[in-house]
Amino acid sequence: MDPQTAATLLPLLGWALHGSVLTRRLASARRDPLTGLHTRAGWTARAEHCIHRHPRAAVLLVDLDHFKTLNDTHGHAAGDAALIATAHRLSSWCGRHGTAGRLGGDEFVTAIRDLDAVDLDALTTALHQPTNYDGTALPLAASVGVCRVAELPVPALTDALAAADAAMYAAKGRSRRGSRPAR
């Protein structure tokens, strides 16, 4: 290759590599590396789209009950197994009806196009099934807060998350291991 052609192609090659690296970094910033679910940043754009396009949309906030105890008793690898199992169950439950994400720690979130099209009891049941880790059945339980976006004065994601959060804490206060709609 002559020097003139190399001088022309080298910057283009550099920009192509930079673009590829940038694309991979952006994608990894939008996916949780442990669970494979969307991160808050990746989930938010999808949830905003969902609640503005679907009048029967709902936002669910899921928090694992007694996760710290599980982590302290069985170790962090067991805690990771519980998070991965929860993510898989939540993602399977959402299916084509919505999108799931991990907010951080042991908090998960979903945006569902139509809550009436899915079985909330099936989610609660799935979240309370033990998961196997290293030959041990780890007990899992979760509290779920539900906000039907149509019941909000203005359909805003921040308000839906706040209402789902309040409902989730009400479910925790009631007895844990359950779901509760926003009031």
Swiss-Prot record:
What's the stated role of this polypeptide?
A: Might be involved in pSAM2 replication control.
Q: Which UniProt keywords apply?
A: Plasmid
SUPFAM superfamilies membership: Nucleotide cyclase
Q: State the source organism's domain of life.
A: Bacteria
Q: Which Pfam families match?
A: GGDEF
Give yes or no: UniProt keyword tRNA-binding: no
* Organism for this UniProt entry: Streptomyces ambofaciens
Q: What SMART domains does its record include?
A: GGDEF
Organism taxonomic ancestry? Bacteria, Bacillati, Actinomycetota, Actinomycetes, Kitasatosporales
Spell out the protein name for this chain: Uncharacterized 19.3 kDa protein in repSA 5'region
Q: Which residue ranges does the record assign to the GGDEF domain?
A: 55-183
Q: NCBIfam families annotated for this entry?
A: GGDEF (TIGR00254)
